């Protein structure tokens, strides 16, 4: 989905839509939206939602994998506005050092990985691309603060040790998951994707948009 603001350059929506048949992490709460009041009967349409905070495009707070980590409302918002490098690594099983060692990362604080060509908005695919913990440490050493992926997690679906998540915690990097990068090519972009101020929250859905930089 593309957004155009006046005469400015085109913004691209990289957010997974939230709907009742969307792919959900196994065991998580399915997304549901319902009208609890209607215009006809109550004077206005008023809806409520039920969902996991990790449904769709979202930011993980450190509290997600650390009882003493920051909650989502305590994250520095400036990290989720600014330039981002988008890298294409399509059909890679795991992002490893050979995939990132030669990247030009001077001044790069945000990096997103596009790992697939087909985006299924209805079926959960457990064969997604993960990130090796060594890559996390490498990116942190280069000054990266935020890492995004079009996968639903940086660890495999059957990995209960969450090694990549804990590498992010140790390196003080932040994770954005389930990006919808179908209409985006590799390059430098402006990025906006702010979390909700959910007090004590372990994650938050975001509306993520990018536009190409010169």
Model-found features: residue ranges?
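Active-/binding-site microenvironments in catalytic and ligand-binding cores
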Residues: 3-214
């Amino acid at each position: 989905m593309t957004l155009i603001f006046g005469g400015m350059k085109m913004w691209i929506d990289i957010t997974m839509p939230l709907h009742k048949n969307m792919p959900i992490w196994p065991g998580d709460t399915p997304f549901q939206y319902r009208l609890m009041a209607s215009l006809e009967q109550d004077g206005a349409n008023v809806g409520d939602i039920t969902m996991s905070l990790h449904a769709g495009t979202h930011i993980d707070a450190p509290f997600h994998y650390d009882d003493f980590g920051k909650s989502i409302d305590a994250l520095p918002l400036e990290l989720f506005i600014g330039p981002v490098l988008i890298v294409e690594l399509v059909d890679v099983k795991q992002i490893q050092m050979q995939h990132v060692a030669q990247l030009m990362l001077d001044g790069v604080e945000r990096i997103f990985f596009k790992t697939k060509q087909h985006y299924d908005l209805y079926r959960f695919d457990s064969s997604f691309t993960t990130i090796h913990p060594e890559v996390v440490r490498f990116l942190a050493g280069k000054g990266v603060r935020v890492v995004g992926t079009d996968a639903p997690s940086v660890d495999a679906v059957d990995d209960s040790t969450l090694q990549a998540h804990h590498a992010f915690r140790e390196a003080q990097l932040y994770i954005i998951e389930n990006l919808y990068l179908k209409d985006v090519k590799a390059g430098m972009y402006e990025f906006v994707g702010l979390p909700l101020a959910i007090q004590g929250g372990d994650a938050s859905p975001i509306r993520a948009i990018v536009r190409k930089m010169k």
